[in-house]
Regions:
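Acidic, glycine-rich A-domain
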Residues: 1-229
Length: 229
């Protein structure tokens, strides 16, 4: 009997492209006026603009795929998003709660989650932990998906100061573990090792180099923590 929370970072930085666009290289020797077609009316050559796939889009797709799989397994799960601007404005968004059915309405709620403000992680972990504690499951797992370290306007005298946010988050994770909730932090930040090894319980984090591999890595992480084929 398993209950899992997927806690998704909704900080403003998750609006960044999942894969940075390739730079356009123009040869210095090329002269556009050598080709009369190159300076014709621009509407003569319509072009298709591909929508930019953002970090938040990959995260939402990953938890939606996991939701489908857990639904088939009969495992309970919830999807929440978090952000904030100071201690008086903590944002905790419900994509799917434990009591919600997995249907078009819950998928739409997850799809509507969008990048907001800062990465105020500690309070979100505490709130998600309280929701997990209320679920009568033998195994409880909290998976935090982020793209950077905890950060907010009042996390220390300088908003770039990492210490307060890291200590607050580490305390929230330790408190969750203390009441029997398995925690795991997943980040797509290449520098994630620098702070996650101090912030998370031993071995309870994963740094992903390729954001597009997030769905596959989440599946491996889940099976590794709850058991499976």
């Amino acid at each position: 009997d398993v209950a899992t929370v997927f806690l998704v970072d909704l900080s403003a930085s998750t609006s960044s492209p999942a894969v940075p666009p390739e730079p356009v290289v123009v040869e210095a020797s090329s002269d556009p006026f050598d080709d009369p077609m190159s300076y014709g009316p621009i509407w003569d050559a319509p072009r298709t603009v591909e929508p930019i796939r953002r970090v938040i889009d990959v995260a939402k797709d990953a938890v939606a795929l996991m939701g489908d799989a857990l639904q088939d397994l009969g495992d309970r799960y919830a999807v929440y998003g978090f952000s904030g601007t100071g201690r008086d404005h903590v944002e905790f968004k419900i994509g799917k709660d434990f009591a919600d059915r997995a249907n078009a309405s819950s998928w739409a709620s997850i799809a509507e989650m969008k990048p907001l403000r800062y990465t105020r992680m500690g309070p979100a972990i505490r709130h998600a932990s309280a929701k997990l504690q209320a679920v009568g499951a033998q195994t409880k797992l909290l998976i935090v998906i982020s793209d950077g370290y905890p950060q907010d306007v009042d996390y220390g005298a300088d908003r770039n100061d990492r210490d307060y946010g890291m200590h607050d988050t580490a305390r929230a994770l330790a408190d969750a573990e203390r009441v029997g909730i398995g925690t795991f932090c997943v980040t797509i930040d290449p520098a994630g090792h620098d702070y996650l090894r101090d912030m998370c319980p031993d071995g309870r984090y994963l740094v992903i180099d390729d954001v597009e591999s997030l769905p596959e890595e989440l599946a491996k992480l889940y099976l590794g923590n709850v058991g499976g084929p």
